[in-house]
A protein has these predicted regions:
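Non-catalytic structural scaffold of enzyme domains
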Residues: 1-195
Length: 195
């Protein structure tokens, strides 16, 4: 049995996580808990073989040496958020603001939206988020796309913001990665106990 803690990056993803776990053929291999993640999470008392997290939380866990599979943000996730933003209001300049591991990779997004100036503001420390949002606003961006906390902070400054959502495929891939990492860890522990 694999003890798994899934840090939900935003409240709306909770049903998706539950559904994906229940539909997996190996769902009986997991004893899981879903925890609503929050800004600047200290990540104390994680009682699991492995965790799943996204953005700053995944980065912090990796830095602290906590076993973590990342809920990866795909280029498709970013494109879907930008399209949603465009449906809400016309814009000329868009800022992608968030954790480095969430907003850095979609460099080809400029090719899909040639009429919009898209600037990426990748951040390593979550505490830099508000400062980077202020910078994006000061530099004349019409809207912001980012994670849950980015959207909450953007609302404070009255700038339109859309959250990057993770789909079922990303959730399933993160669970598969977590299972594989936990099984490798179990085998390594067994080997070290034999020695």
């Amino acid at each position: 049995m694999i003890r798994l803690v899934f840090f939900a990056p935003y409240p709306e993803i909770l049903p998706t996580i539950r559904q994906v776990i229940s539909e997996r053929p190996d769902h009986d291999d997991f004893e899981y808990e879903i925890v609503q993640d929050f800004f600047n999470n200290p990540l104390d008392n994680i009682n699991a073989d492995i965790a799943i997290a996204r953005g700053f939380t995944a980065h912090t866990m990796q830095r602290k040496g906590i076993a973590c599979a990342e809920l990866k943000v795909t280029g498709y996730d970013v494109i879907a958020a930008i399209q949603k933003c465009l449906r809400q209001s016309p814009l000329k300049k868009l800022a992608l603001v968030g954790a480095f591991n969430m907003v850095y990779s979609p460099e080809n997004v400029h090719l899909i939206f040639p009429d919009i100036e898209i600037t990426t503001y990748p951040i390593v420390e979550e505490t830099q988020l508000e400062t980077m949002i202020q910078k994006a606003i000061k530099e004349g961006h019409d809207a912001i796309v980012g994670g849950h906390t980015t959207v909450l902070l953007a609302e404070k400054y009255h700038i339109p913001a859309v959250m990057i959502e993770s789909g079922r495929e990303s959730v399933n891939n993160a669970i598969a990665e977590a299972k594989m990492a936990a099984e490798i860890s179990f085998r390594e522990k067994e080997r070290s106990n034999e020695i």
